[in-house]
Swiss-Prot record:
Assigned EC number: 6.3.2.8
Keyword Acetylation attached: no
Record GO terms (molecular function): ATP binding; UDP-N-acetylmuramate-L-alanine ligase activity
Binding site for ATP: G126, T127, H128, G129, K130, T131, T132
Enzyme class: ligase
One GO CC term, this protein: cytoplasm
Family from the record: Belongs to the MurCDEF family.
Protein name as catalogued: UDP-N-acetylmuramate--L-alanine ligase
Annotated localization: Cytoplasm
Length: 491
């Protein structure tokens, strides 16, 4: 970015006073990396630390950021401000050093709020669907030539990045309720996709507390702002009278302001109509499978329509939507060894969903788009607390697949909880009589175990939020063929 471009940008977003060098602790996370990328492109000096390199840190390095793969006090001493992710503990040596040096230490959402402060902010909140909905809104605004800034929690495939600095007043961002930090944001428009019990440790196990926090978030909208809310969700519907702001509802429900009708799925695409108040009927082809993605698209259409974006721009963006990383992410269709003389192949899909509702939506999308295929799922539970709190829901949802490979729980720093482990979950599913899960304690053996159960016309769902994405990429690299010991040795 040249000096002239930077000067023009400063007329939209005033420079943060006395801030020159911004340091991120936990910079490799998607949400942190996205904000760091926008700030790097605004001309700030960026540094950060994390435990290991990943695509996010590699990309930031290419933008000129200084990345350390260790946490040491000296990393922060030149910083104007330190931004910290929720995964970082207060006794981290960089946090301790920053506080001792009287360097401000802020959470990720505070920096996002600062980026949003002088822009027209569109914040996407909810338990599920945030990342995809944020990407859809961003895609529509880009298609309309509005050149938005966006900060997303997942890879926006069309842009090849989690975040992008635009030249306009629009900032589209995912709003994270996991630590209640979305309360820092003060957007002009807020989407709420749904509200379910998740991250309940943040809310003292009190669902009423979680609901009130969403209301407080919506009250951050100015009185002339707008809440776009999914009326199909019973909790969202219950909260509507308490919002006290202009509201547009969306969903399949008859009383939705933006109503989805005549939904059908053909392979990876959804086809439906949208009825809007005082607007012509919109016939949509969406390049994303599942009714849940039709809901995400309806939210994006509601926001775009309110902003006055032309229908043709909306329709082009949705038909050409390239999706986001690890959200029903198609990794390939691979030929398999013949079974009983019949040639076969298997489709490989990687998905981040790790809550029973998300897993259920992914399975339903797979069944609707490919009804003749067996669903073979490789599932990694995420966190012992979530497995404990939603144990029966997981058992019910996972029982819907045809073949289930279960990895050990990805702890995410939590201590084990008796009875909330993968072996117990496998036993519960087995005892219900629908399915005999295969427990895979060594994730390195997934290619071998999977090869033994595939039969030539399968859809493989690699499902979870831990490190299972690496397994999906490994399966794609191997084209579903397990390595021999000799190949492993020479690889």
């Amino acid at each position: 970015m040249n000096t002239q471009q930077l000067a023009k940008l400063r007329t939209i977003v005033p420079e943060m006073r006395r801030v020159r060098h911004i340091h991120f602790v936990g910079i490799g996370g998607a949400g942190m990396g996205g904000i760091a990328e926008v700030l790097a492109n605004e001309g700030y000096q960026i540094s950060g630390s994390d435990l290991a390199p990943n695509p996010v840190t590699q990309h930031l390095t290419s933008l000129g950021a200084q990345i350390y793969f260790h946490h040491r006090p000296e990393n922060v001493l030149d910083a104007s401000v330190v931004v910290v992710s929720t995964a970082i503990s207060a006794d981290n040596p960089e946090i301790v050093a920053a506080r001792e040096a009287r360097i401000p230490v802020i959470r990720r959402a505070e920096m996002l709020a600062e980026l949003m402060r002088f822009r027209h902010g569109i914040a996407v909140a909810g338990t599920h669907g945030k990342t995809t909905t944020t990407a859809m809104v961003s895609s529509i605004y880009a298609e309309a030539g509005l050149d938005p800034t966006f900060v997303n929690g997942g890879l926006v495939k069309a842009a090849g990045t989690h975040a992008r600095l635009g030249s306009s007043r629009y900032l589209i961002a995912e709003a994270d309720e996991s630590d209640a930090s979305f309360l820092h944001l003060q957007p002009m428009v807020a989407i709420v996709t749904n509200i379910e019990a998740d991250h309940m440790d943040t809310y003292q196990g009190d669902f009423e507390n979680l609901k009130q926090t969403f209301i407080n978030f919506l009250h951050n909208l100015p009185f002339y702002g707008r809440a776009v809310m999914c009326i199909d969700d019973p909790v969202v519907r219950e909260l509507l009278p308490r919002v006290g702001r202009h509201i547009t509802t969306y969903g399949f429900s008859d009383d939705a302001d933006v109503q989805i009708a005549s939904y059908r799925q053909e392979g990876p695409q959804g086809h439906f109509t949208l009825k809007r108040l005082d607007k012509p009927l919109m016939t949509v082809t969406l390049n994303a499978p599942g009714r849940h993605n039709a809901l995400n698209a309806a939210a994006a259409v509601a926001v775009a329509t309110e902003e006055g974006i032309e229908d043709n721009d909306i329709l082009r963006a949705l038909a050409g939507f390239q999706g986001t990383g690890r959200r029903f992410d198609f990794l390939g269709n691979f030929p398999l060894a013949p079974v009983n003389g019949k040639e076969g192949s298997a489709m490989l899909v990687d998905d981040y969903g790790h809550h029973p509702t998300e897993v259920d939506a992914t399975i339903k999308a797979a069944r609707a788009g490919w009804p003749d295929k067996r669903i073979v799922m490789v599932f990694q539970p995420h966190r012992y607390t979530r497995t404990r709190d939603l144990y029966d829901d997981f058992a019910n949802v996972l029982s819907q697949v045809d073949v289930l490979l279960m990895l050990d729980v990805y702890a995410a720093g939590e201590p084990p909880i008796p009875g909330a482990d993968s072996r117990s979950l496998c036993r519960t599913i087995r005892n219900r009589g629908k399915l005999d899960p295969i427990l895979v304690s060594d994730s390195e053996t997934v290619p071998e175990v999977l090869a033994q159960v595939l039969n030539g016309d399968d859809l493989i769902l690699v499902q979870g939020a831990g490190n299972i994405g690496k397994i999906a990429r490994k399966l794609a690299e191997l084209k579903l063929q397990p390595q021999t010991k000799d190949e492993e040795h020479h690889g």
